[in-house]
């Protein structure tokens, strides 16, 4: 009988043209003025967290999403870290994360001083398994004063981070 890990590995290999070769997870696409814009950033000396291009990006993102504001950060780890801090995750809390994910997911939790708890992934979406999540919550947690609490540790489970894997959306409705 094959394990879930073997099934997921086989599923990933089936969608790859050459499963033995390097698979770029985030391949950049350059189709326009990127070189020109990078040179403009270098010439302006604003190449990191401030400058005209950052302001333009934040404004366009806010317009596109309908949000009042948007804040650009250096990478996905920083974005997850900021989201967890804004959700109130702190030292002593616990956060549910999928077993199959980029390390940034668990790192962002640890940066808050919290502990990640890994929930099994499902073969169909490769994301967090809603059934495994329900089983974990039923057996390992209880509600106290409106909060989800880990029975074994007494710590509050304050957040869950669903992750879409290899362009496969996780089952957000099931979660």
Model-found features: residue ranges?
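Conserved PLP-binding active-site segment in aminotransferase class I/II-type PLP enzymes
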Residues: 1-86, 90, 162
